[in-house]
Amino acid sequence: MEESSLSRAPSRGGVNFLNVARTYIPNTKVECHYTLPPGTMPSASDWIGIFKVEAACVRDYHTFVWSSVPESTTDGSPTHASVQFQASYLPKPGAQLYQFRYVNRQGRVCGQSPPFQFREPRPMDELVTLEEADGGSDILLVVPKATVLQNQLDESQQERNDLMQLKLQLEDQVTELRSRVQELEAALATARQEHSELTEQYKGLSRSHGELSEERDILSQQQGDHVARILELEDDIQTMSDKVLMKEVELDRVRDTVKALTREQEKLLRQLKEFQADKEQSEAELQTVREENCCLNTELEEAKSRQEEQGAQVQRLKDKLAHMKDTLGQAQQKVAELEPLKEQLRGVQELAASSQQKAALLGEELASAAGARDRTIAELHRSRLEVAEVNGRLAELSLHMKEEKCQWSKERTGLLQSMEAEKDKILKLSAEILRLEKTVQEERTQSHVFKTELAREKDSSLVQLSESKRELTELRSALRVLQKEKEQLQTEKQELLEYMRKLEARLEKVADEKWTEDAATEDEEATAGLSCPASLTDSEDESPEDMRLPSYGLCESGNTSSSPPGPREPSSLVVINQPAPIAPQFSGPGEASSSDSEAEDEKSVLMAAVQSGGEEASLLLPELGSAFYDVASAFTVSSLSEASPGVPANPPWKECPICKERFPAESDKDALEGHMDGHFFFSTQDPFTFE
């Protein structure tokens, strides 16, 4: 640590010290609580020291401890921490003012506490005056501060336990709500998954429906194409059929023509054959005629010889030759007539050949037309089969599509209904989730508020606990001091009791002597009137302090070996304030009234001392003398006997003059003294054991 002048840390944004007491008890641990502002990075090199108020340098510390490094916080809230100063390093008690100071590793003071002192506790500082809640009485209760603090600590602990139970209940509720939210989220995820699956199925069915629609459109288009092709083929077939019919008609006509030509050819051939046969016959006849002519020529030559002989025969032959010539002319004419017939036959043959060729061509064309027709018929049949197959498939697809469409409609309706149900369910779940999130947010807010309040209560409880520990330590120290003082007072009381017994014996002796003198001078007093009681009362009023004992204060309590002062000299004037417990009273009415008034005065002084506090009462013990002893021992019954002369001197009970509590007449003296001591002294037992 480097030496530097102290700079006053600002109260805003610096380290704040919590619940710093004005005084601390030495020889006990001192716990220092502080909070670090948000954003402060604590270090192990930071330290907290106890400085004098006037200290101007960080090296002028009395003692210091290293600061504790708390766990890192991420919520931006201040960090609470605490350190302890050991009792052996604390300053000595005195009037010097000290303060806590937080010094960082750079040697800069980041915060300082209000000033405080180290001093021993005083007994009267640990008493607390409480007023009763009900207004029925004006009694002030003087109780130990430790009892009040213990009650407050018990209440704080009970409140902390209630808050912890409430926190546990809220955490259980939050856990249940979280589990319910998780279940709802799981159900929502399942519903969303089912919805996504149904959506996928719906999309798949939509795609299938689209594909089926496209396939149906394609098949419809193909069917239209096929129907158009079929119609076209039917038109072609009809055209071909018409052409074939025309060709067949033409072929039949050609066949008829060919048949007619064939018949005509055959007729012509028969005629030609007949003509040829006739020609051959004519040629044969001509040849025969030629041969005959040759023969005739020969014969003519022979006949020339015989011409004459056969003139007539020649003439005949000439006639026959002429006739033959005419026949030959006719035959030649017929042959000439047969030439156009040959030409016509040749033309008919050529026409028949061309007709045959045309018939062959027509046969070939008819065969090709028949083949085309067969092919067309086969293609038509195949097309019809394909169309029938396509129609069957289309019908099947239409039926399947209708079934799929019905099923799809049903599934779509079911899906729409389920989607509506899922939507309603999702809306309900969303509303439930929103409500649960709102409830969880409220619960979180309330839990955060409870946590904050619990942390605050915890901090305050820790501070109160530390304060209670400190006060408990102070109370224990004070109780030890009070116990010592009580022991000293008990010793002094025993000494006072011994001294009072001696004084009582002396007073009895003096009273006996005085009563003897009073009995001797009774006649003189009767003649002199009431002057003697008046003078006696005046003497009592003039010197009441002669009956007082020397004062024993708390300042002399340390000298436990000192003995009480000895009895006064017999020659000193002694005034009896309360002679009733010493011997029977035989004095007159004036003395009784004087003794009663003085007893009432002493009783009022005693009650005032009791109400003002135990210390004053203890200080008045020596001054009250035998009267206080008689009251404390519960043997004073003179007031009762004087108040009611007709009642017996010994009542059936013993009464405490402070709290008016009655005890049996056979009660022990020590018990009554202990009861009286309870009004002025604390118990030596610890009020509670703090763990």
From Swiss-Prot:
One GO cellular component, as annotated: nucleus
User: Outcome of mutating residue 17 to A, per the record?
Assistant: Loss of interaction with p300 KIX domain; eliminated the autonomous transactivation function
User: Which intervals of the chain are annotated as region p300 KIX-binding?
Assistant: 1-30
What does the UniProt entry say about where the protein is found?
Answer: Cytoplasm; Nucleus
- Spell out the residue ranges making up region: Interaction with GATA1: 45-125
GO molecular function, a single term: transcription coactivator activity
Ranges where the record places region C-terminal AD (CTNNB1 binding site): 501-691
Expressed, tissue-wise, as follows:
Expressed in all tissues examined except spleen, with high levels of expression in the heart and kidney.
Q: What is the effect of changing residue 20 to A?
A: Reduced binding to p300 KIX domain; severe reduction in the autonomous transactivation function
Residues found modified as Phosphoserine: 4
Ranges where the record places region N-terminal AD (CTNNB1 binding site) = 1-190
Sequence segments annotated as region (Disordered)? 512-605
Residues in coiled coil = 145-205, 232-339, 417-514
Q: Per its UniProt record, what SUPFAM superfamilies does this chain match?
A: Tropomyosin
Question: In residue numbers, where are the UBZ1-type zinc fingers?
Answer: 653-679
Give the record's keywords alphabetically.
Activator, Coiled coil, Cytoplasm, Metal-binding, Nucleus, Phosphoprotein, Transcription, Transcription regulation, Wnt signaling pathway, Zinc, Zinc-finger
Q: Where does Zn(2+) bind?
A: 656, 659, 675, 679
Chain's role = Functions as a coactivator for aryl hydrocarbon and nuclear receptors (NR). Recruited to promoters through its contact with the N-terminal basic helix-loop-helix-Per-Arnt-Sim (PAS) domain of transcription factors or coactivators, such as NCOA2. During ER-activation acts synergistically in combination with other NCOA2-binding proteins, such as EP300, CREBBP and CARM1. Involved in the transcriptional activation of target genes in the Wnt/CTNNB1 pathway. Functions as a secondary coactivator in LEF1-mediated transcriptional activation via its interaction with CTNNB1.
User: What does the domain comment read?
Assistant: The C-terminal activation region (AD) is used for downstream signaling. Seems to be essential for coactivator function with nuclear receptors and with the aryl hydrocarbon receptor. The N-terminal activation region (AD) is necessary and sufficient for synergistic activation of LEF1-mediated transcription by CTNNB1. Contains a EP3000 binding region which is important for synergistic cooperation.
SUBUNIT field: Part of a calphoglin complex consisting of CALCOCO1, PPA1 and PGM. Interacts with the bHLH-PAS domains of GRIP1, AHR and ARNT. Interacts with CTNNB1 via both its N- and C-terminal regions. Interacts with EP300. Interacts with CCAR1 (via N-terminus) and GATA1.
Similarity-based family: Belongs to the CALCOCO family.
- Name the record gives this protein: Calcium-binding and coiled-coil domain-containing protein 1
> What is the organism field in this record?
Mus musculus
